[in-house]
Every structure is written in structure tokens, then in C-alpha cells.
């Protein structure tokens, strides 16, 4: 900023501003000036553009006009939300000195820094989505990754081994803000992400990280958290924790532990799989018609966030899954009673985080009280449920009768938004506060008692006590009796027919009244802060209760979904395989206007791969995706859309379904397809579920067919993964004859003339044809084009009906081999239209073709 160069020439106020701004050069500084937050110089210009507010000038300093923009303090949350959504960070600078006693500018300091990943204010957060701060670290052995949800205290770290796994973690967690080291090598991995923050190398130092974490948790080492031997993850976690403390300017008592996320604990899904399965976000970037949109009927925001975490991280521990299944089954008869009560609990998790940060507002405490008031009824309802896991949840949620009583006594029924507005603490909670309020409201009998006493003492029957806005309190005596006024009466005002006096006692009362509002508000703020001190010792138990309530909400929701949508409880088996009877796509069946056609599926060690053929639009992709979604739902403990399901161990789910050009990275559709295919072939195991849809479409027919054939062979013979392999290459239907564990299935269709009816029914065996021309006609391709295509199809089929099959059946074609050169005579003939030639032109063509042979 050029203004800093001539520092001494500025006014004292601008010098104060420039000193504070120098401490936060890269972010906007909201500088409190009375009822406004003001921004100056470059900050003002930037804020004017980002917030669409007026850019003005605030006088001059150092001989130069000062660009300025301002926002009212009472509307600051709306403007902060706009800035945070654009990835900006803001330092909030408040007046902490008393203007009445300050010599020079009022003392100010930055009290907090609002960044996209560290927000906890209700107005700035999306209530049904996690808001994560993340840090990434890399060395020669791999990556370290840590995430923190400051609005709940959830702190996680992991050590992705390679670039693909790291990309999948970024896709899964989708952090609002990402910290990275200044020498981070894999910039292409994070470029374009929101909220990127470059940090100095020393913030990732391992010894500093251990020290920071031990200090935060009050421990001597990190062995108890299971992260002691995760140096890369700890480097990321240390940087993240330091950043959180720096921005919040307070201790973080709600961050009490850190958890290691290990690959073997959950089913791994790469970024492409999460995108293709449309778990919480559809391919267009919205939330409609996703798996979450069908499954998420939770009644609390914290329950919704927990369900989404489950969906993105299916667990492999069958003990956990069986417990969830048992709980869902036990709760099915109680959903109608439980959900209305759970709805009243609200977002206790985030309220507790604001309590820990000491930023909780009066209405947060009122909502906390309301949540506590639901616990007795919830506990009574759950007591009748015959389920050990349910009873364990009941115990974890606690009762908190003392805290409920405290908040019922302390906070009025409908408090104002801010404590500075006053009127938050209930009457009767504090005697001194009640006295100050009574003085402020004039709701005391002191003046009446004073008047009676003074009349009796003086014997003056015209004496009365009163008040006016100009002179304050007074004792009035009629002019006829004024000569009898006692000696301690000091004249305050003379009227035509009366004299007004003041006495020391009344003056003292007047001073009390005049300062009572300020003193009442100051005491109220003090009592409000003391409430934090009374609540915070119970923070650990309260967080445990919030977690139990969120889990109960998820399980009650899944019980309701299972009953309403006719889902069944899947059975887990020991051997690899998936057997589905009458399976349905959970999302598609909800958006169809006609009944969904349910289909079976059988994958086992003896039947590891299904080659799926059938018409385009026939339902191949739907059938494949529904299998993956049923597996995913089973591995979060949910019931599934089928008549019966048996499912074995799954370590990863891969999808190679559809593709588009990756223009940002300069990769074609085919390159994207091959990159995803390579990832599958390198990382799939016999316990993986693999969906391969139309491999080889983006290149020449023989290249594509050869690749598809080789990929299928590798998956079936070497990897032995459970594979659904959809293809338009009918030559691949020969694979079951040549390899064990491969079978053909197809989706049926009926063709009548130029029309086609899709049956969407999966049958054993290969499809008889692709129905491509019928689908083209259905799409509205002109009739003359369809007619010409049919003619060309007959020609090709008559020339070499089995050429491609023969080619693949023999030695696999090399992508690097040089194809046979096409004869120039053949090329010339292909472009020749005989019907348009004159006799002379025809004769010339004969001689030309002769010369080409």
C-alpha cells in the first residue's frame, strides 16, 4: 500500500489503521468507526467491487484523498457471507477503548479473522453441509492431509499414498479452505480449488506440530489417538491447528481429540466414482436427484451432515454395520413419535462450537435450552425400544437437568439477537440487575416513599416529588409555603406559583437512574459471560450428547426411509460376491412416472464378470449404477432397494462411466477414459466392485475393441474383481466361451418397424443386436439419414459379418502397429457417385482407376 510509505504524515487515526493493516496485508480489514465498519485505500476499492457498494472518499491524509467504503455494523453478517462465498477472508477490528477517556484515537484491535474454513456464525454456514478447513503436505513418501470442522470440533488426518488417493480425498471432503506449503509440488492437484492459502514451510514442521497438538489436548504424546506414527498427517494437522488458533484469537476447547482415517477402515471411492454415482451432487453440480436427496429426510441439520459423511465414507467393519441394521429394524415402529421431538433439538452441535469459541448468541442459548427440554421425552420414548444400541445412544445423550434449569432461570423466553441489545437475562435471576432495571424503568416506589416522608417531616401539605427532562428530579413546594422549606433544600427552579428544590438524597437517586441503563447492560453482559463459564465445564458431555442425537436422527431417518420406500435388510457374507433379487435404482425409481423394472444380479467367485449388452437407452448404465448404490447403501448400514440382497466384502468401488473432455487439463475424452481405466487396472483387487461402461468408444473401432477385450481379460483373469462390463462391441460376448467366471447378460428391447420399446429387463445371454438405428430414429434423426444408414449397414454386414470378431479372436491388435494402407483406387471409388456421371466422365474414371491399381 503506497500510503504506508509516508507514514508520519498521516493523521493519528490513519496511522493506527495502517499499523493494523500491515499485520494483515493480504486480507480485507473491517475497521470499526462508530456504527460502521470502514475500509480504506485498496481494501475499499476491492470491497466496492466484491460487495457492489459505493466507493467514496474520507477526507485526506498525508495530502492525499482516502478511498473509503463502509457497511453498517448491524448488517455485517450479510456482507461477510458474500465475501466468504467468494473465498475472501476478513479481519474484524473493533473498538476496545472508551472514547470518553481516550486521548487520541480510540484503542482498537483485530478480535477475529473470518475465513471460509473457520466460520462458525450461523448466518455464514450452510446448515446441512460440513464446512471444512484442510491442510495438505507432501514429501517423497506421499501426502499428509488434515481436516477440521471448527463448527463441531471434528479433527481428522490421513496419509494418502499416491496422487489418485489424494485427489479422491479432496473430492470427498471438499474443503472450504485449503492450506498448502509454499514449496508444494503437485499444484495441478489443487489448482482451481476455492480458498487456497499458501503457508510458510516452518508451519508444517513435525516437532512444532507434535508440540501444538499435545498442548491442545493436554497430553504428553499422541499415542492414545493412534496418530503417533503418521508424520505426514501430523505436519498437515499442526499447520491447520495453528491457523485455526491465529484466526479465532481464542482457545479452542471443543477440539479435544484427533482421529486417524485409514484406507482399510472404509470402502475407497476415487473422485470419478463419487462424481459418477451422484452421491450428494449430481453431474450438473446440483443436489437434485442424488442418492442423498432420496435418503436424507433427517430432521436436524447435524443429522443431515452426519448422513452425508456416512455416504461418502462407507465402513467395512461388519460389526458396526450389523449394529446399525439392528437399530434401524428396532426403530421402524417408532419413527412417527421420535421425529417430531428430534426436530425440536435443532443444531446443538454447532451451538456448542460457538459456546466453546465464546461467540454463542442469546438465541443460541435459548435453542440449547429448548434442546435440553426435549431430552426427557426422547429418553422416555427410547426406553421402550428393545435394542442394546438404542439404549447405548439413550445413555450418551444424557439429561442435563441442572443446565436446563440454569438456562430456564437465566434467559428470557424470546431473547434478542445480540446481548448488546439488552433484555437477555430473565427477571429474578440476579437481584442487582433487577434493581438497576427497576431504576432505569422508573418502576420503584422510592419517589412515593420520599414524598410521604418529606411531607410528614416538614408538615408542608403542598410538597410533592416530580421529574422533568430538563431539570431532572425535584421536590416542589407552593410559593405560599416556600418560605418554610428546610435549610437542606437547594433551589433548582423557580416557577410562577411554586419553587422546586433538590436534596442530596434525591440527587444521589437521580445519578443512579441516569447511569442505571448503562450499568444494567454492563451487568447483563457480565452475567452472560458467566453463563459460558458455567456451561463450558460440561462441554465434553454436551458434545457426546449432540453426537448421539445426530446419530439417532440418522438411524430414525433410515428406518423411516426403509419402511416408506420398501427397502430390505441386506445380509453380509464372507466370500466375495453380490446376489441381488429384484434390485432397484434408489433414485431413478423415485423420479419415474411408471413402475421401475426391478432386476436380479449374481456375482460370485465363479461368476466374477458380467458382459452387459443391449440397446442404448436400454438401461445398462442404470443397472450398473444401481448395483454400486445398493452396495454403498449396504455398507453404511442402511436397508436397500431390493427384495433380497447378499453381499460379500468390498474394499473399493470403481466406475468408468461416461466421460467428457477435461479442457482445463488439456485432456481429450479418450484420454480421460484411459486415465480412469489405468487407475482401475492398477488398484482394483478381487474384493473390488468395478463398473466399466463402453470402454474404447473414443478411438477407432479396432483400437477400441482391442482395448476393451484386453481390459476385460485383465479384470477377469488377473485381478478377479467383481465386474459389470457394459459394451457395444458384440465381439466381447465371446469372452464367456474363452474364460471362466464370465457370463453374458443383456437388456431386452422389442423393435417394430421404425419404433422400439425398451423392456429394461435383464436377461441371461447376449443381445441379438444393438438397435442403434432404432434409437437414432427415436431421437429424431431425419428419415433419409436413417434410410441411408440401414443401406450402409446391410453393405457392411454382407462384406464381412465377422471381421472384427475374427481379428480379436486371433492375436490381440497392437495400438502401435501400422494399419494396412488403403488402396488409392478404393478411396477414389468410395467418393464416386456413378449416377451423376456422363458417359464421357465414366470413361475418364475407368482410365484413372486403371492408373491407380
Swiss-Prot record:
Stored SMART domains = MUTSac, MUTSd
Q: Which UniProt keywords apply?
A: ATP-binding, DNA damage, DNA repair, DNA-binding, Nucleotide-binding
Cite the binding residues for ATP.
614-621
Asked if Nucleotide-binding is a keyword of the record, the answer is: yes
PROSITE patterns (UniProt xref): DNA_MISMATCH_REPAIR_2
Q: By its UniProt entry, which Gene3D superfamilies does this protein fall under?
A: 1.10.1420.10, 6.10.140.430, DNA repair protein MutS, domain I, MutS, connector domain, P-loop containing nucleotide triphosphate hydrolases
One GO biological process term: mismatch repair
A cellular component annotation (GO) from this entry: cytosol
**Top-level division of the source organism's lineage:** Bacteria
Is Ligase among this UniProt entry's keywords? no
Coiled-coil segments, which residues?
A: none
Q: Which GO terms describe its molecular function?
A: ATP binding; ATP-dependent DNA damage sensor activity; damaged DNA binding; mismatched DNA binding
Regarding protein family, the annotation reads: Belongs to the DNA mismatch repair MutS family.
Under NCBIfam families, the record lists: mutS1 (TIGR01070), PRK05399.1 (NF003810)
Q: What does this protein do?
A: This protein is involved in the repair of mismatches in DNA. It is possible that it carries out the mismatch recognition step. This protein has a weak ATPase activity.
* Name listed for the protein in its UniProt record: DNA mismatch repair protein MutS
Q: Which organism is it from?
A: Escherichia coli (strain 55989 / EAEC)
Amino acid at each position: 500500500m503506497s500510503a504506508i510509505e509516508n507514514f508520519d504524515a498521516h493523521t493519528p487515526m490513519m496511522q493506527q489503521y495502517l499499523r493494523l493493516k500491515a499485520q494483515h496485508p493480504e486480507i480485507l480489514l473491517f475497521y470499526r468507526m462508530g456504527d460502521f465498519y470502514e475500509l480504506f485505500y485498496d481494501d475499499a476499492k476491492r470491497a466496492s467491487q466484491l460487495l457492489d457498494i459505493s466507493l467514496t472518499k474520507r477526507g485526506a491524509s498525508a495530502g492525499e484523498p482516502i478511498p473509503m467504503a463502509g457497511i453498517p455494523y448491524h448488517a455485517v453478517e450479510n456482507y461477510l457471507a458474500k465475501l466468504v462465498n467468494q473465498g475472501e477472508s476478513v479481519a474484524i477490528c473493533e473498538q476496545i477503548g472508551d472514547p470518553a477517556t481516550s486521548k487520541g484515537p480510540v484503542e482498537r484491535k483485530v478480535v477475529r479473522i473470518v475465513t471460509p474454513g473457520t466460520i462458525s456464525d450461523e448466518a455464514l454456514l450452510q446448515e446441512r453441509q460440513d464446512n471444512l478447513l484442510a491442510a495438505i503436505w507432501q514429501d517423497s513418501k506421499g501426502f499428509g492431509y488434515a481436516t477440521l470442522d471448527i463448527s463441531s470440533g471434528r479433527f481428522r488426518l490421513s496419509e494418502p499414498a499416491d496422487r489418485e488417493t489424494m485427489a479422491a480425498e479432496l473430492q470427498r471432503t471438499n474443503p472450504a479452505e485449503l492450506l498448502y506449503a509454499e514449496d508444494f509440488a503437485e499444484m495441478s492437484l489443487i489448482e482451481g480449488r476455492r480458498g487456497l492459502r499458501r503457508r510458510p514451510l516452518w508451519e508444517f514442521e513435525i516437532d512444532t506440530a507434535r508440540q501444538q497438538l499435545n498442548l491442545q489436548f493436554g497430553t504428553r504424546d499422541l499415542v492414545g489417538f493412534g496418530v503417533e506414527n503418521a508424520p505426514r498427517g501430523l505436519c498437515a494437522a499442526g499447520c491447520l491447528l495453528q491457523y485455526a488458533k491465529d484466526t479465532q484469537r481464542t482457545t479452542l476447547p471443543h477440539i479435544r481429540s484427533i482421529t486417524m482415517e485409514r484406507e482399510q477402515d472404509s470402502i475407497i471411492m476415487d473422485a470419478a466414482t463419487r462424481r459418477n454415482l451422484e452421491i450428494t451432487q449430481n453431474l450438473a453440480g446440483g443436489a437434485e436427484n442424488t442418492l442423498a436427496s432420496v435418503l436424507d429426510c433427517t430432521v436436524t441439520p447435524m443429522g443431515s451432515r452426519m448422513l452425508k459423511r456416512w455416504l461418502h465414507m462407507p465402513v467395512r467393519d461388519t460389526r458396526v454395520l450389523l449394529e446399525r441394521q439392528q437399530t434401524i429394524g428396532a426403530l421402524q415402529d417408532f419413527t412417527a413419535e421420535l421425529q417430531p421431538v428430534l426436530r425440536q433439538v435443532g443444531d446443538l452441535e454447532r451451538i456448542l462450537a460457538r459456546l466453546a469459541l465464546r461467540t454463542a448468541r442469546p438465541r443460541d442459548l435459548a435453542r440449547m435450552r429448548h434442546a435440553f427440554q426435549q431430552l426427557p421425552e426422547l429418553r422416555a420414548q427410547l426406553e421402550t425400544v428393545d435394542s442394546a444400541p438404542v439404549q447405548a445412544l439413550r445413555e450418551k445423550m444424557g439429561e442435563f437437568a441442572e443446565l436446563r434449569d440454569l438456562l430456564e432461570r437465566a434467559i428470557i423466553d424470546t431473547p434478542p439477537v445480540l446481548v448488546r441489545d439488552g433484555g437477555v437475562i430473565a427477571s429474578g435471576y440476579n437481584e442487582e440487575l433487577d434493581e438497576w432495571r427497576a431504576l432505569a424503568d422508573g418502576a420503584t416506589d422510592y419517589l412515593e416513599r420520599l414524598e410521604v416522608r418529606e411531607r410528614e417531616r416538614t408538615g408542608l401539605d403542598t410538597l410533592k416529588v416530580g421529574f422533568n427532562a430538563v431539570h431532572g428530579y425535584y421536590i416542589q413546594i407552593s410559593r405560599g409555603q416556600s418560605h418554610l422549606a428546610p435549610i437542606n433544600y437547594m433551589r433548582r427552579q423557580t416557577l410562577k406559583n411554586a419553587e422546586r428544590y433538590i436534596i442530596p438524597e434525591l440527587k444521589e437517586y437521580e445519578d443512579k437512574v441516569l447511569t442505571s441503563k448503562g450499568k444494567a447492560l454492563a451487568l447483563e453482559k457480565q452475567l452472560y459471560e458467566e453463563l459460558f463459564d458455567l456451561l463450558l465445564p460440561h462441554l465434553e458431555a454436551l458434545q457426546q450428547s449432540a453426537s448421539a442425537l445426530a446419530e439417532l436422527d440418522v438411524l430414525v431417518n433410515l428406518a423411516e426411509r426403509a419402511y416408506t420406500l420398501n427397502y430390505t435388510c441386506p445380509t453380509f457374507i464372507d466370500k466375495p460376491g453380490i446376489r441381488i433379487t429384484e434390485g432397484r435404482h434408489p433414485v431413478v425409481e423415485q423420479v419415474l412416472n411408471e413402475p421401475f423394472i426391478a432386476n436380479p444380479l449374481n456375482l460370485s467367485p465363479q461368476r466374477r464378470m458380467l458382459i452387459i449388452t443391449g440397446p442404448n437407452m436400454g438401461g445398462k448404465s442404470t443397472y450398473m449404477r444401481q448395483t454400486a448404490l445398493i452396495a454403498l447403501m449396504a455398507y453404511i448400514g442402511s436397508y436397500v432397494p431390493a427384495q433380497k440382497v447378499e453381499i460379500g466384502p468390498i474394499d473399493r468401488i470403481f466406475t468408468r462411466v461416461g466421460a467428457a473432455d477435461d479442457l482445463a487439463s488439456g485432456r481429450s475424452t479418450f484420454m480421460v477414459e484411459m486415465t480412469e481405466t489405468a487407475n482401475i487396472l492398477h488398484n482394483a483387487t478381487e474384493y473390488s466392485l468395478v463398473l466399466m461402461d463402453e470402454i474404447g468408444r473414443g478411438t477407432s473401432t479396432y483400437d477400441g475393441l482391442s482395448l476393451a477385450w484386453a481390459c476385460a481379460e485383465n479384470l477377469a483373469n488377473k485381478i478377479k474383481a467383481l465386474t459389470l462390463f457394459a459394451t457395444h462391441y458384440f465381439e466381447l460376448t465371446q469372452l464367456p466361451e474363452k474364460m471362466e467366471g464370465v457370463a453374458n447378460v443383456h437388456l431386452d428391447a422389442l423393435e417394430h418397424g421404425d419404433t422400439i420399446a425398451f423392456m429394461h429387463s435383464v436377461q441371461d445371454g447376449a443381445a441379438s443386436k444393438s438397435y442403434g438405428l432404432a434409437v437414432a430414429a427415436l431421437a429424431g434423426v431425419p428419415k433419409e439419414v436413417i434410410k441411408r444408414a440401414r443401406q450402409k449397414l446391410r453393405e457392411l454386414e454382407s462384406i464381412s459379418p465377422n471381421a472384427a470378431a475374427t481379428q480379436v479372436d486371433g492375436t490381440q491388435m497392437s495400438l502401435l502397429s501400422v494399419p494396412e494402407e488403403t488402396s488409392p483406387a478404393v478411396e477414389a471409388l468410395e467418393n464416386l457417385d456413378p449416377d451423376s456421371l456422363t458417359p464421357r466422365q465414366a470413361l475418364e474414371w475407368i482410365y484413372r482407376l486403371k492408373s491407380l491399381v
